[in-house]
Amino acid sequence: LILMQLKSKPLEIRPALTGANWRGLWTLYAKEVHRYVKIFGQTLLAPIITTLLFLTVFAVAFGGGRTVNGLPYVEFLAPGLLMMTILQNSFANTSTSLIQQKLNENIVDTLMPPLSAMELTIGFVFSGATRGLMVSIGVGASLALIVPVHIHSTAAIVFFAVGAALMMGSLGMMTGIWAEKFDHVSTITNFIILPLSFLSGTFFPITRF
């Protein structure tokens, strides 16, 4: 009798979730930001020191009154180093986070919550972009103590900085999804990211090509 009642009872189909899971998205974003903030010496402070070393070495080697497009070489170099910092750190954050979770076999903890593919993408990309921008603020403040600052367009600075951070965060996420081990991430970094960074006009004008 119970079986007959169960069979005769129509199945109830729960409606699909609609709208964005804002709380889940914020939780993922906050988790990723907390992941690199708690080791700020490695993820935030070290890139600032590295950038200042680049500035020091190239200023000593190619400074000495040399100008590029009418600017002292150090003033030409500083914005390029700032943008290079944004690109490299935004890429490194998302790619490293995903490959670590895959190798530690705890990526299921990220995939199981009720987050759509778009929400996962936004969470990872924006957290990577945040790291790139946080490092750039530290680098910019440090460079401002050494190099004269001439801001011609705040809107252009914000547009290109945020756009570059989001672009490289997206590329880092694609790399993290594709990679199966750290060697794969290193391959993309060493053969694509670094060459593009060094040949992008950071250290010399692109008119030299």
Regions found by a protein language model. Give the residues of each.
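Hydrophobic transmembrane alpha-helices and immediately adjacent juxtamembrane helices
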Residues: 1-209
